[in-house]
Amino acid sequence: MAHPFQLGFQDATSPIMEELLHFHDHTLMIVFLISSLVLYIISLLLTTSLTHTSTMDAQEVETIWTILPAIILIMIALPSLRILYMMDEINNPSLTVKTMGHQWYWSYEYTDYEDLSFDSYMIPTSDLKPGELRLLEVDNRVVLPMEMTIRMLISSEDVLHSWAVPSLGLKTDAIPGRLNQTTLLSNRPGLYYGQCSEICGSNHSFMPIVLELVPLKHFEKWSSSMV
């Protein structure tokens, strides 16, 4: 999860988030190189008194600054499209969980089980126990098995919401009347925190998301106790 004064991304705990971090570094390096080149050229123009006689008519330069940006855009677009297809592709999910956004809480339904559903509300600050996180703890966590492909179906009962868990690289809009889906796969166990990422009313800031990723045998034990 995030910590105070953090400037970078949260630690990646899913293959998608790892790919997003690599893509971020790849794109940032291209931006850095272009910015350095532009600043260098500007500094030369400002510090030299010489004038190039062919500046106003240079076919070779015009060809270069037309082709080179196109190549750079392709270098950015191809990895981006690859990640987009990875995020959209879901093959044989081991579990499906339906998530519904409400003002201002989330409800979850494990569609592979009968009568396994619950609402998840934020725990008020006055009810927090020592060590619990303000505005992030919920009364019912979403327990899921780790190292298994999980399909999340996301929608809303009232207004537009957004279901987001940064460390897993997940952010999917919850739109009334529309069912969106995303893939969830965690490499290691733990608690993963998120929040509603779309302004949805006065209590928008009080819609936390808590995922508890556990080994399969612990998940089976939990699901048996909940049914």
Curated annotation (Swiss-Prot):
UniProt-annotated binding residues for Mg(2+): E198
EC number: 7.1.1.9
EC category name: translocase
Domain of life per record: Eukaryota
Annotated Cu cation A1 binding sites: H161, C196, C200, M207
Assembly description: Component of the cytochrome c oxidase (complex IV, CIV), a multisubunit enzyme composed of 14 subunits. The complex is composed of a catalytic core of 3 subunits MT-CO1, MT-CO2 and MT-CO3, encoded in the mitochondrial DNA, and 11 supernumerary subunits COX4I, COX5A, COX5B, COX6A, COX6B, COX6C, COX7A, COX7B, COX7C, COX8 and NDUFA4, which are encoded in the nuclear genome.
Protein name: Cytochrome c oxidase subunit 2
Source organism (scientific name): Rhinolophus darlingi
